A protein has these predicted regions:
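Soluble, non-membrane globular domain cores that form compact, hydrophobic packing
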Residues: 5-8, 12-305
Length: 305
């Protein structure tokens, strides 16, 4: 039995990043068939697949980012055109549509181009999400019709994904543009490492973020200054309470039992727990503005429960 188990493990390890040929093996999952062409670009017949362990060999230093969002597997195809640069299609299968949205949201900055459930195209890179999939499509160089080729490849890839999926409900629990929400600033996060990359709080995970929690970070323009709103949902009331108390102890020790304090930059930080939610506002010059935004968030939480 041990010999059989060892054999199975060895086979699994050596096939983690396999290269297959032919359309009959072009299936990423039971419902996904990646395209064989896009515009004048045609698939070279090779398909590379990576699981969570093999992902580190494909992208040095970036694998942890996808793993934080529940990465399951990656399929990569290259498309070639005579006289033009190759176009690469990377299709990431995540644990859920919420995770795919999170990957997309993390670096969202360009205008939507109408592909998938959310997309952007800039600097020769097309990014979009649809269902539980996130796609990154780019050319390995410049040339005529490259941009149109990337967009055609994107539309074909999106059409191969039959199912859509919901955005994180938590993203709808924050105030909108009427309260100064900055366009394209909403980030859906599943780890404190990712949170720190967008807005540094502490080296330690003082808010106890994990795959069991959800967090939304967004920027608001208040009195011509940008403030950061962080909304976190925990699995239950106890975990929310533990995280809130730890945050107040470590980050706002000067609050002394209150829900707010000025930090070293002389700006206000406010934090409250509401049931399984923790709401924190960073960097407000005016206490009244911070209170208004925090209260608006609490009202959204009550309305959507």
């Amino acid at each position: 039995m041990r010999i059989v188990t060892f054999f199975v493990i060895m086979v699994w390890m050596f096939t983690a990043a396999e290269i297959t040929r032919g359309e009959e093996k072009g299936k990423m999952s039971q419902e996904i068939f990646l395209p064989s062409k896009g515009g004048d670009w045609k698939w070279d017949g090779k398909e590379m697949k990576y699981n969570s362990k093999a992902l580190f060999g494909y992208m040095d230093g970036a694998a942890e980012f996808y793993l934080a969002y529940g990465f399951e597997n990656l399929t990569v195809r290259r498309f070639e055109k005579s006289g033009g640069p190759p176009i690469v299609v990377e299709l990431y299968e995540m644990a859920s549509s919420e995770d795919a949205y999170g990957v997309f949201s993390f670096e969202h900055q360009d205008e939507d181009v109408g592909i998938g459930q959310g997309s952007e195209f800039g600097g020769g890179l097309l990014r979009f999400w649809k269902g539980k999939y996130f796609a990154s499509i780019y050319a390995e160089g410049e040339g005529a019709e490259v941009e149109s080729g990337i967009l055609e490849m994107g539309r074909a890839t999106a059409n191969s994904i039959r199912s859509t999926g919901p955005e994180p409900k938590l993203a709808g629990f924050i105030p909108g543009k009427d309260f100064g929400l900055v366009d394209k600033s909403v980030r859906y996060l599943r780890s404190h490492v990712l949170l720190n990359q967008r807005f540094f709080i502490a080296h330690q995970n003082i808010l106890n973020l994990s795959r069991r929690t959800e967090a939304v970070l967004a920027q608001y323009l208040r009195d011509k200054e940008k403030v950061q709103l962080l909304l976190i949902r925990y699995p239950d009331l106890k975990e929310a309470g533990d995280a809130y108390r730890n945050f107040m102890k470590v980050y706002l020790p000067e609050a002394r039992g209150k829900d707010r304090s000025k930090t070293e930059d002389r700006k206000w930080t406010l934090a409250r727990q509401r049931n399984e939610f923790v709401v924190i506002l960073f960097g407000a010059s005016a206490e009244a503005d911070a209170e208004a935004l925090l209260k608006a968030t609490e009202e959204k939480l009550v309305a959507r429960r």
